[in-house]
Design a protein with these regions (language model features):
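Conserved ABC ATPase "signature" region
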Residues: 125, 139-160
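Conserved catalytic motifs of ABC-family nucleotide-binding domains
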Residues: 185
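Catalytic Walker B motif of ABC-type/P-loop ATPase nucleotide-binding domains
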Residues: 189-193
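H-loop/switch region of ABC-family ATPase nucleotide-binding domains
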Residues: 224-225
Length: 282
């Protein structure tokens, strides 16, 4: 039985963009435990192509993120071809990868919160070293500290500079994580359900920050099940279901009642107000 919903015939996959590839997956398969969680996933995201990967819990979103960040590895192809490339490369040192592709995930937040006595400034500085603390043997320069203040100001979190990281609210944490992801001036940001746990005001601040970053030329790759996070600048939408791509097309084609109802397995109603989308179940 094919899991591909009927609306796939409606969606028109976007043509390849003549830009350097940000992410390339070629028949990527991932097994976690004894379960195959990604099935022959083929996907190309170009630099400058803001993209949202959308789907229900268990559709493979977290496995996709861990595949890109090299926390999971794909099965080897029998023909020796490469299954995953990021910025054109298939071999990365983790610290170099994360300096080019900023990462904002819930796992990262939890790891930082577990560091005793960590301040916001130290949390953001740790982004320079792809670690959860500032290594004792590494020098922190004045330029680094200035860049920390710059990115915190961009996300509206500069007043938090000397606060303890573990004391922050969910909204404050998200602003600090985005600032941390920006310290190395990455070409792109990978955002994992960034509005989870945020109140209405914090969510609106997050949306405004995302739009600012998109306008500055930072490519956004959003992984979520909240369509409210899909800002207008994100034109490409990839729907995931059961570890496979169910549809790949434009936001106008896919962020609608029918496609979302099919991929989420129940009736979904999409309402648009002043350019903002909201989804309701039932």
């Amino acid at each position: 039985v094919s899991i591909a919903p009927a609306f796939m015939t409606v969606a028109t996959p976007l043509p390849a963009i003549a830009a350097a590839p940000l992410i390339e997956l070629d028949r990527a398969c991932v097994i976690r435990g004894q379960v195959r969680v990604l099935h022959d996933l083929s996907l190309r995201i170009a630099q400058g192509q803001h993209t949202a990967l959308l789907g229900p819990n268990g559709c493979g979103k977290s496995s996709f993120i861990k595949l890109i960040t090299r926390e999971l590895y794909p099965l080897a192809h029998a023909d020796g071809s490469v299954a995953v490339r990021v910025l054109g490369q298939n071999r990365w040192q983790v610290d170099r990868l994360r300096s080019q592709l900023g990462i904002v995930t819930g796992d990262l937040s939890s790891n930082l919160a577990d560091m005793p006595g960590l301040t916001v400034e130290e949390a953001v500085l740790s982004g320079f070293f792809a670690s959860f603390v500032v290594p004792a043997f590494r020098e922190v320069t004045d330029n680094m500290r200035a860049r920390v203040r710059e990115t915190l100001a961009l996300t509206g979190a500069l007043p938090l500079l000397h606060r303890g990281y573990a004391e922050l609210s969910a909204g404050e944490t998200r602003r600090v994580l985005i600032a941390r992801a920006l310290v190395n001036r990455p070409q792109a940001l990978l955002l994992d359900e960034p509005s989870t746990g945020l109140d209405l005001v914090a969510r609106q601040h997050l949306i405004a920050t995302m739009r600012t970053l998109a306008a500055q030329g930072i490519t956004l790759v959003l992984v979520t099940h909240h369509i409210e996070e899909v800002i207008p600048e994100i034109e490409r939408v990839v729907l995931l279901r059961g570890g496979r791509i169910a549809a790949d097309g434009t936001r106008a084609e896919l962020l609608r009642d029918g496609p979302l109802s099919d991929v989420f397995g129940g009736p979904i109603q999409v309402v648009e107000h002043e350019g903002r989308l909201t989804a309701f179940a039932g």
